[in-house]
């Protein structure tokens, strides 16, 4: 009798799993919707969401509605705090890892439940003397891709000016570049703010501000948005400037413009952290999205758009003429950040403490005196 009951129970479980019991719908492996809030560029997040939706269709025959709420890092962070554990989105993606730590302390993130294989493939940190964390030791966030904040330049414009290809930060101070450098103010761009911090933390406060004033003297424009810098450089209107690959820089290269990217020593590198918000309505879809991005297929989304893999397991490579190989050319031959030394001095705590004073000093010493600084060069 007991054996018959066991057989019937097994049959019922199988029937439920296959949806063979009338009126009973089998549970979906993940929810059919996913929403994220992110400062990551549309060029990247649209491609990642589209690739995941296709993967979900192939894997579970499930149509997942995906959507992204674009917001700058401070705005995104502020919204999450305001939601107080009842978020309107499922995932927070991009920005400084220190903000993710703050959200963890406020119990606004859910602990990730990634497979051990996915978690272990990502190193704990990269860079010296100040290691950049690539995953949260407490398990609440994980990096998705490596993206340096560096410089773009137009080789033909440089040649016309008699200036060698840009390799270092100091190359921007070449007198021959006067009026030909583009930048976006740190008051308008978090990436510019991070680069200003790199200079200040590399040289020290006094020498750092002297350097930044000299750069302002060489600058011919302060753009309204950071993404405008690679656009004006690509068109040959300016020779060089601060840029991030995913904010128009690589897109300009794909569009056929003569533009190159370099990450000088100590350039800030973000791991583009990702976390699931506490109280998310679609936690299974969110977890599946993160797992997907850490696969080779997911990492390829980044590698074909000028970013670098978060793990040494993969490197940027593809067929001749592919977008991946164009990305390698664009970055001067770099295929992985794990194949060479990474120098990092950026300290989140210092940057956070100086955030407002940096902007105040910029307005007083550079923005208000820009014309004087240009005449002094």
Model-assigned labels for residue ranges:
Residues 197-263:
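Ligand-binding pocket segment of bilobal, Venus flytrap-like solute-binding proteins
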Residues 72-109, 121-135, 247-254:
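Pocket-flanking alpha-helical
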Residues 69-78, 98, 170, 216-231, ...:
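Short helix-initiation/N-cap motifs at beta->coil->alpha
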Residues 87-92, 110-152, 170, 180:
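A structural signal for short loop-to-beta-strand junctions that line the ligand-binding cleft
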Residues 336-377:
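Conserved C-terminal helix/tail region of periplasmic/extracytoplasmic solute-binding proteins
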Residues 277-344:
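Mature extracytoplasmic/periplasmic domains
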Residues 35, 170-190, 198-200:
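Short loop->beta-strand "edge-of-pocket" segments that line small-molecule binding or catalytic clefts
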Residues 28-102, 230:
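Early extracytoplasmic/lumenal segment of secretory-pathway proteins
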